[in-house]
Amino acid sequence: MIIGAATLLSSCQTYKVSHTYNPPSFNQRVVKGEPSIKIDKINDVRNLRGAELGAIKNEVGISIKSIQAKQPISEITRTAFSHALKSRNLLAEIEAKYLHQADVLQFEGSQYSTQNAECRIRVHLYQAKTGRLIYSQYYYSTKTKVSPNVSYWSNVEEIAVVASEALQDVVDRAVDDQKLRRMLR
């Protein structure tokens, strides 16, 4: 009986979640530009494996639910940057002046006593014709949400929302960075 209880308490199921990027709404002020950026490489260089995002842990810190994205993290990040650039009229489908690359250094969401998400991305901008690096910057965001459910019944989708907010914050700050925008002139 003790072995059965220990197995039940230590078993960890994996749940796949979606992530979304919401372009700025009409009442949010964003600076539009000219289509000049093409998304090139998005590299997932996190310490987590594949689409892994994190876990929900019980009161003693044992993982009870493992959280994975439904798509590779590099694809989620590419989609977010694509939507962000397009909503600001910066995405060039053809004949881009600049190539956008990014390294996803950290993107994870978890719950122990609160729902937490962290996202850290290094963005690079290259001249398309010469391949010369003209801009490189780190962007970081952390989001936290208090949740009354800290148990097996915790909702993995709520953690996905918090993680999506962290990713959105990083992507929006990167695309709206005044230093980056000055490079585009």
Regions found by a protein language model. Name each.
Residues 1-2:
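Sec-dependent signal peptide recognition
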Residues 12-75, 79, 176-185:
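A structural "domain/chain start" motif
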Residues 13-30, 88, 129, 133-185:
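C-terminal/domain-edge helix-coil "capping" segments
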Residues 33-35, 96-100, 115-121, 135:
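Envelope-exposed proteins and targeting segments
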Residues 34-41, 91-110:
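A short, hydrophobic beta-strand-centered structural micro-motif
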Residues 63-71, 112, 152-157:
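Second-shell loop/turn segments in exported
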Residues 73, 77, 81, 163-170:
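Stable alpha-helical elements in mature extracytoplasmic
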